[in-house]
UniProtKB/Swiss-Prot annotation:
Disulfide bonds: none
Listed cofactors: Mg(2+)
GO molecular function: ATP binding; magnesium ion binding; UDP-N-acetylmuramoylalanyl-D-glutamate-2,6-diaminopimelate ligase activity
Designated name of the protein: UDP-N-acetylmuramoyl-L-alanyl-D-glutamate--2,6-diaminopimelate ligase
Binding residues annotated for meso-2,6-diaminopimelate, in chain numbering: 381, 405-408, 453, 457
One BP annotation, GO: regulation of cell shape
Enzyme superclass (EC): ligase
Cited Gene3D superfamilies: Mur ligase, C-terminal domain, Mur-like, catalytic domain, MurE/MurF, N-terminal domain
Record's function text: Catalyzes the addition of meso-diaminopimelic acid to the nucleotide precursor UDP-N-acetylmuramoyl-L-alanyl-D-glutamate (UMAG) in the biosynthesis of bacterial cell-wall peptidoglycan.
GO terms for cellular component: cytoplasm
Length: 484
């Protein structure tokens, strides 16, 4: 590709370098090699304009900067654009050029990882070569890689989509985080459909209000999806109505799912210990589904996934039958084991108020004894959610143990105190390993334990150091000790 091939995205007309070969796209000056186009992005911690000279020294073909950036005196062309992040995403899409032919994205506060994984599984069972991209990484035929970002940066994303397409993947589902949408990471992805799960308090360290957070989510529907594309929206959330209105205003084909859904209507559900039996109406036909996952929220996630699969061509009967073979996403109400007396221990990623409320409420119907929870809140993040989560835990669980969960640069005792202020009767055990072992030791027949916060993650960040720590490993170790 030559620089002139990015015309329409970048102002390359008349540039001396227009006929030179582009060898790459980057927003990290350390990755610049001769022929790479460098994008100077303004970030929260650093401004890419400060690294433009370094990029030029490393051989950048051109530097792309915003109109407000002071980038001058470089020995390479400086291309000025209104929105450097948008230009980066669109340039990356054009540079890498290919993606799976059917792409869907799902947004919401909770459930994105599960919906992306479930949609992939439905497609797989329908016989399609499918992939999912999100918080737990990339899963595709012959590929299972862990990742740390919900929505990868545009260069990594479009490179990945090219690799998946080259490997024969034709269907792909991905998570669309509010950060990713706001920072234009998904722009340039050709989406066939979009999904919405729910909205609750999250990322208040990034978004000034919940309304601003919701507006960021809506970019999926009012900006990224083409007119007429399916928008599969869970209908039973307080934020469903404004999301439906926005999608309709954008000219999308709104398909609602859930108890109040029109496209897939949940008529009845019966909870069992590790599974649920549901009746779902679709196109006037009633389907009985035996979902091998616990929790109301998993029914909701499964319906959004089925809606995405059906709206992109999977037959209704095949999609709903596939729900009976779903496997939960790693760290999402993940049954790690049971005690000798049969008490189950789950690990869940719930680190937000709504997610904690959902997971605790979901195990109550099949718990004959006590619901117990071990959780904490992260440091250097939304401080306002700490007492909210403390209140939720004490309201919905019978035994609450407050512990540490990535305190980062904050004093751990201060974080715990903020939670405990709204959690009368909660037990404080700062050491997360000890907290898990103590909780497992307290279990009796009929009890259920949730270890919340980390899910699939395998680290505990204290200060600037991340130490290896796995809730799964600690639960298994505690269960072995008690069984000995």
């Amino acid at each position: 590709m030559k620089l002139r091939d990015l015309a329409g995205v970048l102002p390359v007309e008349g540039t001396a370098s227009a006929d030179l070969e582009v060898t790459g796209i980057s927003s990290d000056s350390r990755q610049v090699k001769p022929g790479v186009v460098f994008f100077a992005l303004a970030g929260t911690k650093a401004d890419g304009a400060a690294y433009a000279a370094d990029a030029a020294r490393r051989g950048a073909l051109a530097v792309v900067a915003g109109k407000s950036n002071s980038v001058a005196g470089l020995p390479v062309p400086v291309l000025t654009v209104d929105d450097p992040r948008l230009a980066l995403a669109l340039s990356a899409a054009r540079y890498f050029g290919k993606q799976p032919r059917t792409m869907v994205a799902v947004t919401g506060t909770s459930g994105k990882t599960s919906v992306a994984a479930f949609t992939r599984q439905i497609w797989e069972q329908a016989g399609y070569a499918a992939a999912s991209i999100g918080t737990t990484g990339v899963v595709a035929p012959g590929r299972n890689e862990y990742g740390s970002l919900t929505t990868p940066d545009p260069v990594a994303l479009h490179q990945l989509l090219r690799e998946l397409a080259d490997a024969g993947v034709t269907y792909a589902s991905m998570e669309a985080s509010s950060h990713g949408l706001d920072q234009r990471r998904l722009d340039g992805v050709k989406l066939a459909a979009g999904g919405f799960t729910n909205l609750g308090r999250d990322h208040m360290d990034y978004h000034p209000t919940v309304e601003d957070y919701h507006r960021a989510k809506l970019r999926l529907f009012d900006t990224l999806l083409p007119k007429g594309a399916p928008a599969v929206i869970f209908a039973d959330d307080p934020w469903s109505a404004p999301t439906i209105q926005a999608a309709q205003a954008a000219g999308l084909n709104v398909l609602t799912v859930g108890r109040h859904g029109d496209f897939l209507t949940l008529k009845r559900v019966e909870h069992e210990r590790h599974r649920q039996r549901a009746e779902v109406e679709a196109e006037g036909v009633l389907y009985e589904i035996d979902l091998p996952l616990a929790g109301d929220f998993q029914i909701s996630n499964a319906l959004v996934s089925a809606g995405l699969a059906i709206s992109t061509g999977t037959p209704v009967a095949k999609a709903l039958a596939a729900l009976e073979k779903l496997k939960g996403a790693p760290g999402r109400l993940d049954l790690v084991g049971t005690t000798v007396s049969g008490a189950p221990v789950y690990v869940d990623y719930a680190h937000k108020p709504d997610a904690l409320e959902n997971v605790l409420a979901s195990v109550r119907p099949f718990t004959t004894g006590r619901v117990m929870v071990v959780f904490g809140c992260g440091g250097d993040r939304d401080r306002g959610k700490r007492p909210i989560m403390g209140e939720i835990a004490t309201r919905l669980a019978d035994v609450v143990i407050v512990t540490d969960d990535n305190p980062r640069s904050e004093v751990p005792e201060t974080i715990r105190a903020a939670i405990l202020a709204a959690a009368p009767g909660a037990i404080e055990i700062g050491d997360r390993r000890k907290a898990i072992h103590e909780a497992v030791g307290m279990l009796h027949a009929g009890d259920t334990l949730i270890v919340a916060g980390k899910g699939h993650e395998e680290g505990q960040t204290i200060g600037s150091e991340t130490l290896h720590f796995s809730d799964h490993e600690e639960v298994r170790a505690a269960l072995r000790e008690r069984a000995a």
